[in-house]
Each structure stands twice: as C-alpha cells, then as structure tokens.
C-alpha cells in the first residue's frame, strides 16, 4: 500500500491517541504521536508532517495557546482540531471535528483535506 502521508496525532488521552495511531497506520499513513503540545513541538522540529490531528484541550501546552502557536508557526500545515469542548468566543482557524468521533469519518475528513488543500498559506 503506498504511503498516504505523515500524520502527527496530538492527544493527551492514551486510548484515543494509540487507537487512532493504529487505525491510521493500517490505512496507509505514517503516524507520529505526542501526548501534549510540548511533545508535538519536538515532533514538528524533527519531521516535516503533512497533517496534524490535535486535541484542543490538553494539560500541557493546549487550548488557546496551542491554537495560537499553530496559527503562527504552522500556518502552511493541514490541521484538524478535535475537541468535546470549545469556547464559543475563541475562533479556531482550522477544521474542527467534535468528540466523540468515528475514526472512519475522521479519515474521510483527512482524505478530503489532503486532496483539496495542499497546505495552508500564511
């Protein structure tokens, strides 16, 4: 199966992070994982990822600061934010998938974003 791209999953909930990693790997993606924004920074420094799937609410470098970081420093990356909680007054400049989500539906969202958006422009 040809490689479909390198995806970084940023999720503090172990069961979601690991099962999503396994699911996307079986679908042909290379997958990196991080449990918080700090771990994601390390991955982003070491690898040129094609797409980021990130939880919004994480204890370490999550929430509004993580979104601000992504907006400023990852504006050319394809990004999907996942969350069961988003503040209505904070604008998310990326695609959002609400928890709980179906992995098949999330993959369809990833495929669509990879095909239609070669990367965000600053």
Each model region followed by its residue ranges:
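The feature encodes the CheY-like receiver
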Residues: 59
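Short amphipathic alpha-helix used as the core "switch/output" element in two-component signaling
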Residues: 42, 64-75
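C-terminal output helix
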Residues: 21, 101-118
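Hydrophobic/aromatic residues positioned on beta-strands within the core alpha/beta folds
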Residues: 81-83
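Acidic, metal-coordinating helix/loop segments flanking the phosphotransfer/catalytic sites
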Residues: 33-51
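Active-site residues of response regulator receiver
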Residues: 55
